[in-house]
């Protein structure tokens, strides 16, 4: 099987390098991210997928897009907001839709969360939160859930897309915790789960160890990474 490389920058920021050498960036937030390695930067990207508008998921989208020239894929309202910040290459889409970027098929899935930005003391709605299923060149599919609670239609994500790897939030408080994430793993039918969105802030108390205790008896691999680490 061709190599897939995953680099984690802490929180929910990942660079996934596909078997064909494409770099998919998810939710880039480096500046002010207490878990990001010192001096971390993302200077190569083929596509940037942004799940929702909260600053801990959008903080470096504009910087990375300008540095790399990569298009930004997001729900329509969020893509329009990025355009208002000067980005020219955006792909606005919506739930259930699929687009193709540089040979990668990207489908937008629902998430149960919220999405907004605070500017000049005012909160601006930025469309619904989302997740993504990306079909790689070798046919494998990965599911990046974004920030979400557990929801029953994860079963439909399994039925429609059959992802092999899921990136799931486990920190609790703002998203699901390990117990709900374990049920998500079962509903999705994935072979491997990459925990994210934990330990960044005191409120995010869910841990990878708690998730491992719940899903390893299912035969599911839990990929626990250190910020800045790349796993294949």
PLM features: residue spans?
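Beta-strand-turn-beta hairpins that frame and shape the catalytic cleft
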Residues: 1-4, 17-24, 98-106, 135-142, ...
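Zn-dependent metallo-beta-lactamase
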Residues: 1-23, 30-33, 210-218, 227-230
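Pre-active-site segment of Zn-dependent metallo-hydrolases
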Residues: 15-54, 59-66, 77, 114-125, ...
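Active-site neighborhood of phospho(di)ester-bond hydrolases with catalytic His/Asp-centered motifs
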Residues: 25-28, 45-53, 73-76, 142-148, ...
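Active-site environment of divalent metal-dependent phosphoester hydrolases
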Residues: 32-33, 54-59, 79-82, 97-100, ...
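Glycine/small-residue-rich loop that forms an oxyanion/phosphate-binding "nest" at active or ligand-binding sites
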Residues: 59-117
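Binuclear metal-ion centers of metallo-dependent hydrolases, dominated by the metallo-beta-lactamase
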Residues: 71, 83-98, 182-232
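Active-site-proximal loop/helix segments of hydrolase catalytic cores
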Residues: 118-187
């Amino acid at each position: 099987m061709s190599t897939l490389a995953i680099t984690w920058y802490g929180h929910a920021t990942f660079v996934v390098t596909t078997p064909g050498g494409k770099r998919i960036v998810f939710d880039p937030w480096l500046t002010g991210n207490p878990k990001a390695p010192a001096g971390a930067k993302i200077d190569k990207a083929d596509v940037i997928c942004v799940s929702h508008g909260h600053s801990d998921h959008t903080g470096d989208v504009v910087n990375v897009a300008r540095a790399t020239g990569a298009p930004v894929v997001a729900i329509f309202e969020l893509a329009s907001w990025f355009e208002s910040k000067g980005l020219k290459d955006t792909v606005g889409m919506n739930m259930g839709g699929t687009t193709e970027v540089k040979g990668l098929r990207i489908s937008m899935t629902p998430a149960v969360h919220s999405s907004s930005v605070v500017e000049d003391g005012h909160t601006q709605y930025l469309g619904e939160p989302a997740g993504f299923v990306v079909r790689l060149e070798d046919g494998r599919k990965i599911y990046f859930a974004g920030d979400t609670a557990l929801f029953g239609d994860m079963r439909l994500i399994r039925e429609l897309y059959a992802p092999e790897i899921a990136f799931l939030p486990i920190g609790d408080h703002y998203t699901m915790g390990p117990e709900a994430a374990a049920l998500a793993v079962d509903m999705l039918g994935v072979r491997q789960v990459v925990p994210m969105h934990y330990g960044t802030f005191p409120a995010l108390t869910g841990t990878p160890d708690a998730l491992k205790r719940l899903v390893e008896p299912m035969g599911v691999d839990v990929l626990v990474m250190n910020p800045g680490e790349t796993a294949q």
